């Protein structure tokens, strides 16, 4: 019954009913709940209107009447729940339309503003919840949709479709599409039904056109959801298909294009996923054909093809076929099918279609039989698009029908189509003919005759004639065709066969081939001419050498005239080329053949003066020759010339060829003659490659013409030929080619050279490579020396550099790689240096600072840098390293600002690269700096790093070891060079000094990269070798040692091992540690040895960190012994050295729990504590604040770069002046982390130093957050051993936080004695004591989380000790530090003490903690005695402070301890009232204004009032007796004006106390109020004034509740309205105004008359 009733009530719970409840639900899309509660109707309306105005600018559809109506001013206070059903339905229509129009813009903030108004005013989150859910569902993966779901008032449990969304509303996370897809399958596809219905409903509201234009995301989501159902083919069952088919049908029939496309995509995916039954397939095909629309006809037919390809469709229904034949006029089905046939396989479709068409054509009763034949003919009209299977199918169908008596008469087009198919697909035709011939040979013959394709049978038979048997050969004599067949032997057969061969029957050529050919040309006997041409080709050059030149030229002219210009096709061009390939042609004759003789042509050669015989070519072709004929002649002649191995060459021939190229360039339609250009350019290239005796120079090679052709051509073959021509020309005229080479590099022009495609780029790339190789190696017949080759390379590279900035950025890589392949690794660095030199030669210093900054990394430098980096990237990594080394050495050879005196041959090449004598000093400096910067970029190149990483350890050692030591040496030399130049600056030139400092920094970066780029294995070997040399050699290279140690540090610190694959061998690490131990000595004199000791300590620290933990190691034990020995002498040693050794010792303690570390832990800790104490003494505030910068303490200043390096850790980070302190703290922390139980006796000293450092370097409250054991900072700092990375206070704070963490883990039983000692030691240091109690509070909280029971028992035992020996001795500070400037600090100290007491209270029960409170009360209570001294009386202040802190933390839980404290508060108020107590002896506390005594008295009164005020909050505790106890003293405080701060005390503290007392005892409030009003009759104006202030504030607190007490107030106010003191009168008027504001104007008029 209960269940039924619940169900009925739930059904009645409508949206309107829910909004009629007492509490209105505050819902917002843009604001959180707290802000939504404050959102007024007017504000929501303004937000909505602002959003609507913005949406109108985005989409004009929002500028409509209904929108204005929805957003009108009248709707501000609209209450939807009061609407009737009809009005609500009408409103729903308006809202649904607006939501549909908003949905595409959900992620626009203006849309969210509109939704905010609709949610607030129309409660659409409840009334239109499902509409909101569906409308914006396509945005399910956005945050805003998640927020929208969260605010919906939707019954998720009752909705089977959307129940899955409830889990996402709780977390407010976006909904993945996979979740929706799973829910769709689990809900039996009802979600798809909902979305489809939503789309239909949307069409009814906004129309299909609007929906299709504005909501593509909705259709995409619908289709995507449908497709998701096919991801698992096993789940596609009958039920799913039954659900899907209606969606598909509705989609195909839909007038909306997007819906149709969605349905087609679903069909395609469905047929690809599963095999469908025939009835389903027929239904789909029928839908696609019968519901085809013009705008999606191509897509429908494409989908149909997919169905036929993937499924086995056997037939089409008659009605479907008729619909296909009688399609709409706007749909050209057969044209679309033809286009599809060219792109995809349509075999299955046409096989079925043709079969159905033939069946329909036989139906005499059908009106479509003729149309079927027409369509059949149209679909087989183009045989070129048919496949073999299609051809076989159509041939078999038509021939089979013919054999069955169904001949398509009077269809000439069909006969021609069948014939074309049979000819094109002879093999298929032959197979079908053989198949049908076996059935009925005679009938088939008649059918073939009827279709007039009998000859195709013979054609097909000949095609397979090769399969005839050779067992018997029938030889029939030509002269005796009727002779009998003779059976011959094998030898006789062979002899007869040879005699009957074509070779035996060949006629023997007699006579001169040229004369015969000329005779046959005139007689147009073309086969004979070709015979003669073949004879010429066989006779070859010997034949032509015996012929007269004029005869040969005359014959060539005849051939050109007949074949080239006349266009005779019977003569094969190949025969002509072969025949004339050996002819010795005069270069002048060749030039004439390529010339047009019209008297005005620009390409005609100049004639010499005097009489001259008429040119034979001109005589043949005349001056009236058309350009078309001339072009035909030129193409033919060029074709002949290109067929020759060597073309007759001369200056005139080259000029004529270039003239042909130019003539084509001058045409508007250049591409139509690209073949002619192609032939001409190839001919020029052949001449340049084989010039014979012709001298070719710059004047003969028209490079301008070639470049112009390259710029304008769109033919990649011609482009390739032109680039090859440039390479060939480079052998003869390198200077001219180089001058024009810019166009090659910069891709100028508007033709194909400009295109960004692989073909163009590969052509240019190969050309550039060949060009460089050719120019470098070409020098006539002489063999170039190495230096000559380098000189030519420098010259070419400099010319290339001039055009480098014009090369597009995306093409630079390929060009640079091509150059790298040409110049090889040995010359790569030279090219790079020339590039940089060219850039710096053009560089100008800008006077404008902003422009100079912009020029630092301008586009020009980017271009040069990119080319250089890509050029080197083409080399293998070891070649790259070698090239970079050469560049570094070049920089070093270049020298400083002053040039070197001596020069060598090597210097000559250096000068060619960069001639410093021809450059200004700024450019020399810039060149040097740019080279070093470029080297840095090369080392940072990811390609180099990845290639090195691809090698294994063995290959790296083999290839890189020879380079390794040189890399180290080079880095040292670079460093020393920069250091020397920087130190040589005397300061007279600030600009030079700045430059060399910057250059030194840059070289340092390069040096580091040089070293650190070395692979791990090579680095390990180098480090071992160098250190061994340093140990064995008396003249140790400390500089080299420093570098290798830095390398070791990077490898150990970053990679954690030296070998990438196998990891470093433990034995090798120990060996390295043994070598380094020798440098760990207490050095005080040699700076190099001191620096070496520091570096070795750092490296040993990393080794200790990476070595496996060992119980005992002789090497590390020796290291530990050395560390302790050095640290013990810290007063004589450098602080940085001592700090590094301390870090090493700390790491040994942390990483290796050995006997030696335990043994030395105590002595090491004592030394660390001593150093910390000295640091604390040294870091006294005045001295510390005035201390010099860290760098100033180092001798030599910035001028000595070695000293600057010394101030840095090996990681490159600066040490501060507190280095030793940080290192000592680190070591202390390590000791306490590992061996706290062994060094218990030093705990007190550690705590003392910890507290003093906290007092000096940071506020404890700020550090508290750092030191929580559960905080993320603990985890972040756990693994670090370096301290130098933390600067100054940050590093100290970090170490102090870690020490605090260690102290928090010490057992409580050992702490009390140390805490008591600490309190005694720090009794005069307030900040240090605050740090101590912060530590104790943290300790209690930490232990309470980890060991609550053990802690509770320990605290119970130690609570009295804590009060007597820790807490109360600290609170005495108030009586000892009685200075005004320390007053606030004392308060802060007490606050930290009481925080500790409160932390104890949190773990004890009420009874257990009462002992602590009683102890404190007993400690303070003697201060109330008359004879008590000032120190005892000040204890009362501390007690009241504690009471208020206790209440703040525990509220009402603190009241059980307030009994006696409340009484003490009343007594304090009474005994501190200087107005009522006339004698000073009777006063508890008193003092003159501005004195410390006045501050203490004011504080005591304030705390006492607050105690009473806090107690009065709780009626149960604040009984009538207690109310009476405090009422008089509280009211009497009104007259206590003699104590400083009276007015503030009254307004801020006294008024709340009185108000709360009145609330606690309402019956006594009138009496209390009357006592207050009686104070207004005091003779002292100040008291009257203060009483009125209290009254005014009290009325504000009470509010309307003051009305019952007006009868008490009015008489007193009447008296005061005309007070003799103007200030009192004004304050009285303010009180009256306040009452008038509450009770009206008539209030006071009535009261005054009364």
Curated annotation (Swiss-Prot):
GO terms for biological process: maturation of SSU-rRNA from tricistronic rRNA transcript (SSU-rRNA, 5.8S rRNA, LSU-rRNA); positive regulation of transcription by RNA polymerase I. The keyword Nucleus applies. It comes from the Eukaryota. Residues 1183-1210 are annotated as: Disordered. Pfam families: BP28CT (PF08146), HEAT_HEATR1 (PF23243), U3snoRNP10 (PF12397). SUPFAM superfamilies: ARM repeat. GO terms for cellular component: 90S preribosome; small-subunit processome; t-UTP complex. InterPro entries: ARM-like, ARM-type_fold, BP28_C_dom, HEAT_Utp10/HEAT1, U3snoRNP10_N, UTP10. Keywords: Nucleus, Ribonucleoprotein, Ribosome biogenesis, rRNA processing. HEAT repeats lie at residues 1609-1645. It is found in: Nucleus, Nucleolus. One of its GO terms (molecular function) is snoRNA binding. PANTHER family: BAP28 (PTHR13457), HEAT REPEAT-CONTAINING PROTEIN 1 (PTHR13457:SF1). Belongs to the HEATR1/UTP10 family. Involved in nucleolar processing of pre-18S ribosomal RNA. Involved in ribosome biosynthesis. This is HEAT repeat-containing protein 1 homolog. It comes from Caenorhabditis elegans. The lineage of its organism: Eukaryota, Metazoa, Ecdysozoa, Nematoda, Chromadorea.
């Amino acid at each position: 019954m209960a269940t039924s009733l619940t169900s009925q009530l739930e059904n009645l719970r409508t949206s309107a009913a829910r909004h009629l409840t007492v509490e209105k639900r505050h819902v917002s899309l843009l604001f959180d709940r707290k802000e939504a509660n404050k959102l007024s109707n007017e504000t929501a309306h303004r937000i909505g209107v602002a959003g609507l105005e913005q949406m109108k600018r985005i989409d004009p559809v929002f500028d409509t009447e209904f929108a204005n109506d929805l957003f009108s001013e009248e709707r501000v206070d609209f209450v939807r729940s009061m609407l009737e059903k009809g009005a609500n339905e009408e409103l729903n229509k308006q809202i649904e339309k607006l939501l549909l129009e908003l949905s595409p813009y959900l992620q626009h903030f203006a849309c969210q503003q509109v939704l905010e108004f609709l949610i607030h005013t129309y409660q659409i989150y409840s009334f239109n919840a499902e509409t909101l859910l569906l409308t914006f569902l396509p945005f399910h993966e956005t945050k805003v949709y998640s927020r929208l779901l969260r605010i919906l008032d939707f019954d998720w449990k009752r909705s089977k479709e959307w129940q899955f969304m409830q889990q996402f509303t709780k977390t407010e996370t976006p909904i993945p599409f996979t979740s929706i897809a799973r829910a769709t399958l689990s809900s039996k596809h009802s979600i798809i039904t909902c979305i489809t219905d939503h789309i239909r409903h949307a069409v009814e509201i906004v129309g299909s056109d609007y929906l299709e234009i504005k909501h593509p995301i909705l259709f995409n989501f619908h289709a995507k959801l449908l497709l998701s159902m096919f991801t698992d083919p096993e789940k596609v069952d009958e039920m799913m298909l039954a659900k899907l088919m209606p969606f598909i049908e509705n989609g195909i029939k839909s007038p909306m294009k997007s819906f149709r496309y969605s349905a087609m995509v679903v069909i395609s995916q469905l047929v690809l996923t599963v095999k469908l039954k025939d009835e389903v397939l027929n239904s789909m095909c029928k839908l696609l054909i019968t519901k085809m629309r013009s705008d999606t006809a191509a897509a429908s037919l494409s989908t149909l093809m997919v169905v036929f390809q993937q499924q086995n469709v056997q037939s089409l229904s008659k009605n479907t076929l008729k619909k296909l034949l009688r399609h709409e006029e706007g749909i050209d089905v057969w044209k679309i099918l033809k286009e599809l046939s060219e792109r995809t396989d349509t075999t299955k479709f046409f096989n079925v279609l043709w079969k159905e068409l033939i069946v329909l054509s036989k139906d005499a009763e059908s009106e479509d039989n003729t149309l079927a034949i027409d369509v059949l003919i149209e679909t087989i009209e183009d045989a070129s698009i048919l496949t073999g299977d299609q051809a076989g199918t159509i041939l078999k169908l038509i021939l089979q029908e013919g054999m069955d008596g169904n001949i398509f008469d009077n269809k000439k087009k069909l006969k021609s189509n069948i014939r074309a198919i049979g000819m094109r697909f002879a093999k298929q035709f032959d197979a079908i003919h053989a198949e049908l011939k076996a059935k009925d040979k005679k009938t088939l013959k008649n059918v073939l005759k009827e279709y007039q394709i009998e000859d195709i049978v013979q054609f097909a038979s000949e095609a397979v004639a090769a399969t005839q048997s050779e067992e018997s050969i029938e030889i029939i004599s030509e002269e005796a065709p009727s002779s009998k067949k003779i059976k011959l032997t094998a030898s006789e057969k062979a002899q007869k066969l040879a005699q009957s061969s074509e070779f035996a029957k060949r006629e023997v050529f007699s006579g001169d081939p040229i004369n015969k050919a000329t005779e046959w040309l005139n007689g147009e006997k073309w086969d004979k001419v070709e015979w003669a041409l073949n004879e010429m080709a066989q006779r070859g050059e010997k034949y032509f050498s015996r012929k007269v030149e004029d005869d040969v030229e005359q014959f060539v002219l005849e051939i050109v005239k007949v074949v080239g210009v006349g266009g005779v096709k019977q003569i094969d061009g190949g025969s002509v080329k072969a025949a004339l390939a050996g002819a010795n042609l005069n270069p002048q004759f060749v030039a004439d053949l390529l010339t047009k003789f019209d008297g005005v042509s620009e390409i005609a050669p100049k004639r010499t003066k005097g009489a001259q015989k008429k040119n034979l070519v001109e005589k043949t072709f005349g001056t009236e020759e058309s350009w078309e004929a001339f072009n035909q002649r030129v193409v033919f002649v060029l074709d002949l010339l290109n067929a020759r191995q060597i073309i007759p060459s001369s200056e005139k021939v080259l000029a004529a060829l270039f003239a042909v190229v130019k003539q084509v360039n001058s045409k508007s339609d250049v591409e139509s003659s690209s073949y002619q250009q192609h032939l001409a350019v190839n001919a020029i290239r052949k001449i340049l490659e084989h010039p014979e005796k012709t001298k070719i120079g710059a004047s003969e090679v028209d490079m301008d013409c070639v470049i112009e052709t390259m710029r304008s051509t769109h033919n990649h073959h011609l482009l390739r030929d032109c680039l090859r021509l440039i390479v060939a020309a480079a052998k003869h005229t390198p200077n001219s080619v180089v001058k024009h080479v810019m166009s090659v590099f910069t891709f100028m022009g508007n033709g194909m050279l400009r295109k960004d495609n692989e073909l163009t780029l590969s052509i240019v790339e190969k050309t550039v490579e060949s060009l460089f190789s050719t120019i470098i190696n070409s020098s006539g017949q002489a063999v170039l020396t190495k230096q000559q080759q380098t000189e030519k390379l420098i010259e070419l590279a400099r010319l290339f550099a001039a055009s480098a900035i014009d090369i597009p950025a995306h093409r630079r890589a390929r060009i640079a790689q091509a150059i790298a392949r040409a110049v090889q690794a040995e010359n790569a660095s030279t090219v790079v240096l020339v590039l940089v030199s060219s850039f710096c030669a053009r560089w100008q210093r800008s006077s404008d600072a902003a422009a100079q900054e912009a020029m630092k990394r301008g586009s020009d430098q980017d271009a040069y840098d990119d080319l250089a980096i890509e050029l080197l990237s083409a080399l293998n990594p070891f070649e790259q390293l070698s090239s970079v080394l050469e560049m570094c050495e070049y920089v070093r050879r270049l020298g400083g600002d002053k040039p070197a005196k001596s020069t060598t041959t090597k210097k000559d090449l250096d000068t060619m690269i960069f001639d410093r004598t021809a450059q200004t000093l700024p450019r020399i400096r810039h060149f040097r700096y740019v080279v070093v910067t470029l080297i840095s970029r090369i080392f940072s190149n990811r390609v180099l790093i990845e290639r090195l990483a691809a090698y294994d350890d063995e290959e790296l050692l083999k290839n890189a070891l020879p380079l390794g030591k040189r890399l180290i040496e080079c880095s040292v030399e670079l460093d020393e060079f920069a250091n020397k130049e920087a130190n040589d600056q005397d300061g007279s030139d600030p600009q030079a000094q700045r430059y060399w400092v910057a250059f030194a920094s840059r070289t340092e970066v390069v040096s580091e990269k040089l070293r650190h780029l070395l692979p791990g294995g090579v680095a390990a070997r180098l480090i071992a070798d160098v250190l061994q040399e340093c140990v064995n050699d008396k003249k140790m290279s400390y500089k080299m040692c420093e570098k290798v140690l830095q390398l070791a540090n990077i490898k150990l610190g970053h990679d954690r091992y030296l070998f990438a694959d196998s990891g470093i061998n433990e034995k090798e690490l120990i060996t390295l540690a043994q070598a380094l131990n020798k440098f760990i000595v207490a050095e005080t004199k040699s700076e190099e040895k001191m620096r070496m000791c520091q570096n070795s300590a750092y490296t040993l620290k990393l080794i200790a960190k990476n070595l496996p933990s060992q119980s005992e190691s002789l090497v590390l034990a020796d290291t530990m012994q050395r560390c302790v020995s050095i640290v013990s002498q810290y007063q004589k040693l450098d602080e940085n050295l001592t700090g590094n050794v301390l870090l090493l010792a700390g790491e040994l303690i942390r990483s290796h729990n050995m006997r030696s570390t335990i043994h030395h832990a105590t002595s090491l800790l004592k030394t660390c504590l001593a150093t910390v104490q000295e640091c604390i003494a040294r870091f006294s505030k005045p001295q510390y604040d005035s201390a010099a910068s860290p760098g100033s303490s180092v001798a030599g200043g910035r001028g000595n770069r070695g000293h600057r390096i010394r101030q840095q850790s090996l990681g490159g980070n600066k040490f501060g002046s507190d280095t030793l302190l940080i290192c000592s703290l680190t070591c202390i922390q390590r000791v306490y982390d590992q061996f706290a139980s062994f060094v218990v006796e030093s705990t007190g000293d550690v705590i003392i130093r910890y507290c003093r450092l906290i007092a000096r370097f940071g506020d404890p409250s700020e550090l508290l957050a750092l030191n929580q054991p559960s905080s993320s900072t603990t985890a972040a700092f756990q693994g670090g051993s370096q301290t130098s990375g933390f600067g100054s206070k940050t590093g100290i704070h970090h170490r102090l936080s870690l020490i605090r963490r260690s102290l928090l883990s010490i057992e409580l039983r050992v702490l009390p004695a140390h805490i008591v000692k600490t309190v005694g030691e720090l009794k005069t240091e307030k900040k240090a004591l605050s740090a101590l109690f912060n530590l104790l509070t943290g300790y209690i909280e930490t232990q309470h989380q980890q060991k609550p029971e053990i802690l509770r028992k320990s605290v119970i035992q130690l609570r009295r000790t804590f009060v007597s020996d820790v807490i109360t001795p600290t609170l005495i500070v108030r009586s000892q530090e009685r200075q005004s400037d320390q007053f606030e600090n004392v308060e802060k100290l007490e606050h930290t003490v009481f925080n500790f007491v409160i932390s104890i209270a949190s773990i004890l029960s009420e009874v257990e903690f009462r002992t602590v409170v009683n102890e404190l009360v007993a400690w303070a209570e003697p201060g109330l005695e008359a004879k008590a001294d000032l120190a005892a009386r000040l204890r009362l202040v501390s007690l009241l402070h504690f009471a208020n802190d206790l209440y703040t933390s525990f509220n009402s839980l603190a009241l059980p301890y307030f009994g006696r404290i409340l009484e003490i508060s009343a007594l304090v108020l009474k005994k501190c009232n200087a107005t009522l107590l006339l004698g000073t002896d009777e006063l508890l506390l008193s003092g003159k204004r501005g004195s410390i005594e006045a501050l203490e008295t004011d504080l005591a009164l304030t705390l006492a009032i607050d105690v009473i005020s806090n107690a009065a909050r709780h009626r149960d505790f604040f009984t009538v007796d207690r109310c009476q106890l405090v009422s008089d003293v509280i009211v009497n405080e009104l007259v206590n004006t003699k104590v400083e701060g009276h007015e503030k005390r009254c307004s801020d503290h006294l008024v709340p106390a009185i108000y709360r007392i009145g609330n606690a005892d309402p019956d006594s409030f009138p009496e209390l109020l009357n006592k207050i009003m009686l104070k207004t009759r005091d003779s002292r104006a100040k008291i009257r004034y203060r009483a009125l202030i209290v009254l005014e504030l009290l009325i504000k607190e009470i509010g309307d509740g003051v009305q019952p007490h007006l009868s008490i107030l009015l008489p007193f106010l009447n008296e005061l309205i005309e007070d003799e003191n103007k200030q009192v009168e004004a304050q009285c008027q303010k009180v009256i105004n306040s009452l008038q504001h509450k009770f009206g104007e008539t209030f006071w008029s009535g009261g005054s008359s009364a």
